[in-house]
Amino acid sequence: MAGHSKWANTRHRKAAQDAKRGKIFTKIIRELVTAAKLGGGDPDANPRLRAAVDKALSNNMTRDTLNRAIARGVGGDDDANMETIIYEGYGPGGTAIMVECLSDNRNRTVAEVRHAFSKCGGNLGTDGSVAYLFSKKGVISFEKGDEDTIMEAALEAGAEDVVTYDDGAIDVYTAWEEMGKVRDALENAGLKADSAEVSMIPSTKADMDAETAPKLLRLIDMLEDCDDVQEVYHNGEISDEVAATLE
């Protein structure tokens, strides 16, 4: 399956993500601790933990750091007394947004999330208001690669779909519980992915224009700056032309 330029939807956010690397590590460690606490310390027997490990490695976290986080979770560290909360809402241009949080205080978290939505021209919705537009999937990404080789190996390993973008990037989609197994199979075939993570994939896209795109990006940045927010998923689509105006 072919797709538009993936780069257009990521390049304008890379610098901001790099600047937030310390906060990203903190959030990944929190997820590692929680996943190990809830499902045990063996990634092969704990899909949520395996997904967190893959994300940690994709973000260049050292094995020593992630192993310490897993040990904290297995040992009952206080940081593991968290619950996963999903908030749903609408952003600029009618975008559907899902915000995944890990929190020990619902009141604090919902206040921060609601503030970000209202500040950026969006609004927090009710449970189920946009969730039906998203499916939880594993996404294994290659910046470049041979489409036929990756597709053959991925589908043989149990992947659900392979998408090639105009700029040469390739995404392999899997059932989220199977992502680790498929990634291992690809690596055994000599195909090392640039990243692997569990994501919420939208079934429809909302096209952003030069007015709504920066507003959406501001909302995403505000949400990601909240300590309790782990991930922000949305269905906004930014074209190459609009992305060029953001640089």
Curated annotation (Swiss-Prot):
The record's Gene Ontology cellular component field reads: cytosol
Task: Note the superkingdom of the native organism.
Answer: Bacteria
Annotated region described as Disordered, given as residue ranges: 1-20
Task: Tell me the compartments it is located in.
Answer: Cytoplasm
Q: Does the keyword Zinc-finger apply?
A: no
InterPro entries xrefs:
Integrase-like_N, TACO1_YebC-like_2nd/3rd_dom, TACO1_YebC_N, Transcrip_reg_TACO1-like, Transcrip_reg_TACO1-like_dom3, YebC-like
Name where it mostly resides.
cytoplasm
Its keywords, alphabetically, are:
Cytoplasm, DNA-binding, Transcription, Transcription regulation
* Keyword Cytoplasm appears in the UniProt entry: yes
Tell me which Gene Ontology terms the entry assigns under biological process: regulation of DNA-templated transcription
- One GO MF term: DNA binding
Q: Which family does the record claim for this protein?
A: Belongs to the TACO1 family.
Mind telling me what this protein is named? Answer: Probable transcriptional regulatory protein YebC
Read off the lineage from the record. Bacteria, Pseudomonadati, Pseudomonadota, Gammaproteobacteria, Enterobacterales
Which gene is this protein's source?
Answer: yebC
